[in-house]
């Protein structure tokens, strides 16, 4: 069973407006006028979770544009649906970058000699170009998976007071480099890693956000002084059309405890985090999404750890769902089931984290063919820096075989 090909709800209305008013190109990046106004204790190397195993559980974004006298016609829509940007609906194919310096790409970590994007532009340009050459149309890039170093400034009370000296310029340089590489970006703001307790590692303080998320005033400071300036930095870039979506947080369920109010299994948090209840995380994500809506026209999603918690974010204002897949998840929520099989029919679904080497029961080519044929809206592998030549070649072969329906 396939989900509806068109985006629903808010995204459908935006897409309808784009179809009536927008103009778009047919390959590469979208026309600037349309896409530029779219509505769319861990170690230093950080934690990549995705272990949403266990039993229980169950089972496109849209874009808008300024008025134009030219009708918007998509001449190469994805088979079975996808993510809509401007007037183009494509299977959103890409790779997790996911970082060059964990928690240091945007702002840097001076004490560890970890520099931000601007200072390492040549390295990032090479990596982005490599992803594009391997068929990726989007790179999922982590921003603040932990808050440390110079990325965020705190006041004397320990509350977020603004972005660091180079954070804004690093964001804008990332967009410029994406333009040069002809690749689009999905910035992932936070991760469950942020919920590790505050600590000192090698003279560098890492600030855990559980106390910020659960206090209304401190949460407001985080959003007003960090989230909104990040979104504004994107919108002020001449290359803002390269920003296709915000992933608000990577695998939030791994920083949650207690029951789900929507009927999913109870949460099973990472043992090293300071977990919060569903209601507390949902409030944080709702507030963050509201701020992103106010200051950015990019699409919005939440990087759910697995189909185990398929209902977790169904009442939030996101444009499409993203879920993660690995061998443990696959034991209980097999990769070869459609979104509709898991009870998800209201919004597009992208698999935004799965091994570049594939699963024990399916190589990457088989995974991609399954998701493409069963109505998923996209697939973003983990991760470019982990991929070998054969895996990159397999992903490129998938794109070449499917053609323009998987290329933005």
Language model features by range: what are they?
Residues 75-318, 324-331, 345-347, 354, ...:
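Active-site mouth of glycoside hydrolases
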């Amino acid at each position: 069973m396939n989900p509806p090909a068109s985006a629903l709800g808010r995204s459908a209305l935006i897409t309808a407006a784009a179809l009536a008013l927008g103009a778009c190109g047919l390959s590469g990046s979208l026309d600037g006028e349309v896409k530029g106004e779219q509505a769319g204790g861990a170690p230093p190397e950080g934690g990549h979770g995705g272990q949403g195993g266990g039993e229980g559980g169950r089972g496109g974004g849209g874009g808008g544009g300024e008025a134009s006298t030219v009708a918007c016609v998509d001449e190469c829509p994805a088979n079975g649906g996808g993510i809509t940007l401007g007037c183009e609906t494509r299977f959103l194919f890409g790779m997790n970058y996911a970082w060059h310096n964990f928690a240091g790409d945007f702002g840097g970590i001076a004490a560890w000699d970890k520099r931000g994007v601007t200072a390492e532009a040549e390295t990032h340009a090479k990596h982005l170009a490599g992803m594009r050459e391997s068929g990726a149309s989007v790179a999922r890039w982590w921003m603040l998976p932990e808050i440390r170093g110079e990325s965020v400034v705190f006041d004397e009370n320990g509350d977020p007071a603004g972005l660091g000296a180079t954070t804004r310029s690093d964001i804008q340089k990332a967009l410029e480099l994406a333009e040069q590489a002809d690749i689009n970006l999905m910035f992932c703001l936070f991760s469950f890693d942020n919920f590790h307790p505050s600590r000192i590692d090698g003279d560098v303080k890492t600030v855990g956000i559980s106390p910020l998320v659960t206090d209304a005033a401190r949460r407001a400071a985080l959003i007003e002084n960090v989230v909104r300036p990040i979104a504004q930095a994107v919108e002020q870039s001449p290359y803002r059309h390269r920003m296709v979506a915000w992933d608000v947080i990577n695998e939030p369920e791994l920083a949650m405890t207690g029951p789900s109010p929507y009927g999913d299994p109870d949460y099973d948090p990472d043992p090293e985090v300071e977990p919060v209840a569903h209601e507390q995380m949902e409030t944080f994500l709702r507030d963050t999404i509201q701020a992103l809506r106010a200051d950015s026209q990019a699409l919005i999603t939440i990087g759910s750890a697995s189909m185990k918690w398929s209902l977790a974010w169904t009442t939030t204002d996101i444009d499409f769902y993203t879920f993660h897949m690995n061998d443990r998840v696959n034991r209980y929520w097999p990769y070869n089931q459609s979104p509709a099989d898991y009870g998800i029919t209201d919004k597009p679904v992208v698999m935004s984290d799965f091994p570049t080497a594939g699963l024990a029961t399916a190589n990457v080519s088989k995974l991609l063919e399954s998701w493409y044929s069963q109505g998923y809206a996209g697939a973003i592998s983990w991760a470019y820096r982990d991929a070998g030549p054969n895996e990159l070649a397999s992903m490129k072969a998938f794109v070449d075989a499917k053609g323009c329906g998987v290329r933005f």
